[in-house]
């Protein structure tokens, strides 16, 4: 099997990659939402992967990952890899998770990556209040990303610990 084409469409604001093969199997991958500017970066790799075997995912990726693995190029490379794994799974008649080592758990906790609450300030207590609101949300699993670093100068807040699960999965 050989790759015959790579195309990118912007659907909404998301770059969607389609890789086609000479055997009629297509693979689809998605880049980060709200980043339509990734389209030319994804297309940059087209000629580098044409003619390659898409089921040799790691070999194809070694050839392009060196060309750019940091943002925003890394997002472009990841979308291509996603499409390659899609082809490999379809070709083998297996879901991709089986190709990646198999099922580890029956349930996966949802990460709250988009529900945000307005902050009243930038003090540690404000972050703790914001995190409590996120904890009380039905998804109850989130991460503070707003300029808080493990190595930053933010003081500890009583009862708030980095890396401690808010609630274990049932």
Task: Please report, for each region that a protein language model flagged, where it lies by residue.
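Short loop/turn motifs at secondary-structure junctions
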Residues: 2, 43, 138-140
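Flexible, glycine/charged-enriched surface loops at secondary-structure junctions
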Residues: 57, 96, 141-143
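Residues that line or immediately flank small-molecule/substrate-binding pockets and catalytic motifs
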Residues: 10, 33, 148
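Metal-dependent enolase-superfamily TIM-barrel catalytic cores that perform enediolate-based chemistry
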Residues: 107, 112-170
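Metal- or metallocofactor-binding catalytic centers and their adjacent structured scaffolds
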Residues: 20-94
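Short, Gly/Pro- and small/polar-rich lid/capping loops
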Residues: 1-18
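Glycine-rich, aromatic-flanked loop segments that form ligand/cofactor-binding clefts
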Residues: 81-118, 137
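Cofactor-binding beta-sheet edge motifs in enzyme active sites
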Residues: 3-5, 29, 109
